Amino acid sequence: MFIKWGDRLMTKTLHLTKVTIRNFRSIKVAHINNIGDIAVFVGANESGKSNILKALNWFGTDKPLGGDDIPVEFLGKENKEYSKKPIIEAYFEIVNKDKFKEKIISNIKEILEVIKVDINEDILINFEDMLNKIQFLKFEKYADGLFKTYIYDDQLEDITKEFYDCFKNVISKKTPLDLFNLIYEEVLKEEVKKQNIPENQISNAVANIRGNPNFNNHYRKILDEIRTLNTFEEFYEICKRIENIVKSIPNTSVSISIPGRNIQLNPYNIFTEILTKFNSIVTIAFINLKPKFVYLDEEMELKGAVIKNTSWSNTLKEENKTTLLMPDFLE
């Protein structure tokens, strides 16, 4: 089995250097190190080579682990240790720093626009200096589909906390709690506007929604969870806890009394939207850098999470009957 990505290396932003796969299908643990432009896996039939491709393909999605991908010993029972450990750890080197910085800065500006935070250009310049320090990224993917990102300098020193401290300055030193409240208010205003409420009644309508037990009770539970952490270093854990609360909300509409009439709103849908926007505060900065893999099977048909254009398959015809894997990063 070949893993190959060569002639377009410099058009990519990231390059996979090593990966560890644990407890995926038949794989107990597999360490693949020193990955260059071409890597060759040699093994007998049914030795698990194809499961490496399947693992990397799953890694490039947001899906939780399920079906045949879960090892037999973990089926049919809750295993907390299994869910705590990452299924896949993958290290990537940044091979196009300019493109990396351009994409991250662009995404952060998008975040600031979405959450209505003014852009401080001087601080943004300092943040660009922070991006210059980053040379490697580590992505972890867990059985529930959760991703975590760790940031390293050229000496492989973990500078994730330094990154978040710098990021916090970019967003005007607001805490996760500040930002959740800001997003909550904005989403409720948008929902009220959809109901054709007059402009001069929007504030009162939002206050009525916030005071309704169907919203206020869930809101307070979420605030309690955020307060226990409330740092960007713990951002992923905060989002996971909020998600658990949102999942418990009934997916039904409730009647809300606002000035002049009653309206129907679905708390589950609204809190889901709030969680999505809240989660994007940090993750959107890296979301488009998450690797997605595509490969050719023995019949030379394209498989995987990303569909490549025909020029890729045409250049690989000479590799017939060989399984090829190409990570598709930022183009």
UniProtKB/Swiss-Prot annotation:
Keyword Electron transport: no
Gene Ontology molecular function, alphabetical: ATP binding
Pfam family, one: AAA_15
Keyword NAD: no
Key words of the record: ATP-binding, Nucleotide-binding, Plasmid
InterPro entries per record: AAA_GajA/Old/RecF-like (IPR041685), P-loop_NTPase (IPR027417)
Gene3D superfamilies for this protein: P-loop containing nucleotide triphosphate hydrolases
Sequence intervals crossing the membrane: none
A GO BP entry: DNA synthesis involved in DNA repair
Positions bound to ATP: 43-50
Protein's name in the database: Uncharacterized protein MJECL44
Species whose genome carries this gene: Methanocaldococcus jannaschii (strain ATCC 43067 / DSM 2661 / JAL-1 / JCM 10045 / NBRC 100440)
Lineage of the organism: Archaea, Methanobacteriati, Methanobacteriota, Methanomada group, Methanococci
